[in-house]
A protein has these predicted regions:
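Conserved inter-motif catalytic segment of the P-loop NTP-binding fold
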Residues: 18, 23-47, 55
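Glycine-rich P-loop/Walker A and Walker A-like loops and their local beta1-loop-alpha1 context
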Residues: 1-21, 25
Length: 91
């Protein structure tokens, strides 16, 4: 699996498309509602290309639910990076 991460509008999807295969984009949105992040990471690792937007930089949200969602997204990204054959960070 190729894992591509980076900020919004950094060209992740454009970079990913030529690789073909099964692709899933913006997986950070799945993390907040996941019962088990390791199980979700295992499921997503079955794709050929996975992209996630980095949400951990910048202003920390006041809302606890938004902070928890960002934390979950970051932990999911770490799990995906550990399972990936290759990780690409876009800037």
């Amino acid at each position: 699996m190729l894992f591509i991460t980076g900020p919004l509008y950094s060209g992740k999807r454009t970079f990913a498309k030529p690789f073909g295969g099964r692709q899933i984009y913006e997986v950070q949105t799945l993390a907040a509602n996941a019962e088990s992040l390791p199980a979700l990471a295992d499921e997503l690792a079955q794709y050929d290309v996975v992209t996630a937007t980095e949400v951990g930089g910048g202003v920390v949200p006041i809302d606890p639910a938004q902070r928890a969602a960002r934390e979950a997204a970051g932990r999911l990204a770490c799990l995906l990076a550990a399972r990936a054959e290759c990780v690409v960070q876009m800037f």
